Amino acid sequence: MKKLFTLVLLALCIAVLAPTTSKATHLAGGDITWAPTGVPNQFLVKVKLYRDCDPSAIQLPSTVEVCYSSLSLNFAATVTANIVQIIAAPVSICVNVGTNNCAQAGSPGDTEEHTYEVVINLPQQAPDWVFATQTCCRNNAITTLTNPGGAGFLIEARLNNLLAPADNSPVFATLAFSKFCVGNPFYYDQGATDADGDSLVFSLVDAEESSNFSCPYTAASLPYVSGYSGLVPLSSSVPITINPQ
């Protein structure tokens, strides 16, 4: 089975570090994954949100609301996902984002990952389940979106458990956030793996927010600064491309 795995690079999953940097004060990225629990129509849903490690950055909440909906079933509901408590470790961990970064841990651009989990019992199988969360707001340091600090942050994951009742979602193989230096060569692998061995298709999309702010969410593309889009997240002398496989 082929799965479409949309990479939400959004212009907020990439922090460009120049000699002068801006500190992030809002959300820097996120993703949603799921895995079957072994109980029919029951899935463990994980939400990961990323924020700047800087102490002045806005703190993320201890819970997030997850909407799960199916248009074909005319069904929508919300559940609360709690932040994961890890024994002998802080709830959120500041990490140095990769080995090809410009500076040491604790420098601008380092990221804090918050993981939330909730078990969702779907009422029945459907080809169009959507797991989604909407919150506010995006990183004020983003330069490719207009008014990023006032823009909502919507992420979605889509499940067809009619085709695959015990389906696993793709999972990023590496940390879903990176930073790099202007003018330096950079290689960034944001590939993913799938426990079911399904083939994956990658694509770039626009950054989104919800236009209705209620479950089920209605996705709306955010306005980009002239010259940028989901397909053109960075200015480059060579066009940005992605290998769909």
Stretch-by-stretch model annotation:
Residues 1-28:
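Bacterial Sec-dependent N-terminal signal peptides
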Residues 22-245:
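Long, compositionally biased, intrinsically disordered segments
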